[in-house]
Swiss-Prot record:
Keyword entries, A-Z: Ribonucleoprotein, Ribosomal protein, RNA-binding, rRNA-binding
Family the entry assigns: Belongs to the universal ribosomal protein uS11 family.
Keyword Flavoprotein recorded: no
Entry keyword DNA-binding: no
Domain of life: Bacteria
Job of this protein: Located on the platform of the 30S subunit, it bridges several disparate RNA helices of the 16S rRNA. Forms part of the Shine-Dalgarno cleft in the 70S ribosome.
Stated name of the protein: Small ribosomal subunit protein uS11
GO molecular function, one term: structural constituent of ribosome
Subunit structure: Part of the 30S ribosomal subunit. Interacts with proteins S7 and S18. Binds to IF-3.
HAMAP family with a match to the protein in the record: Ribosomal_uS11
A Pfam family the protein falls into: Ribosomal_S11
Length: 129
């Protein structure tokens, strides 16, 4: 006889007017997350979630679509001001921040938190096409 599984309860996240915008932009994808002031995620989106595949995922347009989807949900829940934390070397960093600002959420600060190695791992070799 199969065991009955209980569906996990959805957490209730407290949304106040101030929050955080996290933009993670890699060479292959872009992930946009909006969190409350304590760091609990309110909404998130990515270029892959928006239906982009392959090399189209790391474009400014894909970042714009992901940020628009994420910002609309958070704005409806009551988020109005954010600090933007940007991480990674990808293309759509500025595009995502502009889109969130255009959706009615005020961006008060932009902070670059890209991790920089102090000569750690060897980088991948150059492509020869």
């Amino acid at each position: 006889m199969a065991k009955k599984t209980v569906a996990a309860k959805k957490r209730n996240v407290k949304v106040d007017a101030n929050g955080q915008l996290h933009v993670h932009s890699s060479f292959n994808n872009i992930i946009v997350s909006l969190a409350n002031s304590e760091g609990q995620i309110i909404s998130w989106s990515s270029a892959g979630k928006m239906g982009f595949r392959g090399s189209k995922k790391n474009t400014p347009y894909a970042a714009q679509m992901a940020a628009q989807d994420c910002a609309k949900v958070a704005f409806d829940l009551g988020l109005r001001k954010v600090k933007a934390y940007v991480k990674g070397p990808g293309n759509g960093r500025e595009s995502a921040i502009r889109t969130v600002h255009g959706a009615g959420i005020e961006v008060t600060e932009i902070i670059d938190v890209t991790p920089l190695p102090h000569n750690g791992c060897r980088p991948p070799k150059r492509r020869r096409v």
